[in-house]
C-alpha cells in the first residue's frame, strides 16, 4: 500500500517503513507526526482525493533534524567588478513512515 501526501509545499509518494527527507517540521526527535493532506491511496483498492481523501491519514516518526549540503549563489556583473557570493543550507527533517490509514 502506498499514498501520496502533501507536506512543505511538495507532494511525495510514500510507503510504510520508508525513510523520507521533508521540509523542517516543528516537532522533536522521536515524536509522532500525522499528515492529513493525503491526495491518493493506492494498493488493492484505489482512493483518489478531490482534493484530499477524507478520513485518510499517514503517521510517521521523526528520526532527526539536519541541514542539507551548502549551495552557493554567486552573481556578478561582467567588467564592473561587482560580485556577490552567498551560501545557503536548507533545513530538513528525516521521518520514517509508520502507518497509512485509509
Swiss-Prot record:
UniProt family annotation: Belongs to the bacterial ribosomal protein bL21 family.
Name of the featured protein: Large ribosomal subunit protein bL21
A molecular function GO annotation: structural constituent of ribosome
Secretion signal span: none
UniProt organism field: Geobacillus thermodenitrificans (strain NG80-2)
Gene Ontology annotations of biological process type: translation
PROSITE patterns (UniProt xref): RIBOSOMAL_L21
Keywords associated with the record: Ribonucleoprotein, Ribosomal protein, RNA-binding, rRNA-binding
Keyword RNA-binding included in the entry's annotation: yes
Subunit structure comment from the entry: Part of the 50S ribosomal subunit. Contacts protein L20.
InterPro entries, alphabetized: bL21-like, bL21-like_sf, Ribosomal_bL21, Ribosomal_bL21_CS
Membrane-traversing stretches: none
Functional note: This protein binds to 23S rRNA in the presence of protein L20.
PANTHER family: 50S RIBOSOMAL PROTEIN L21, LARGE RIBOSOMAL SUBUNIT PROTEIN BL21M
GO cellular component: cytoplasm; ribonucleoprotein complex; ribosome
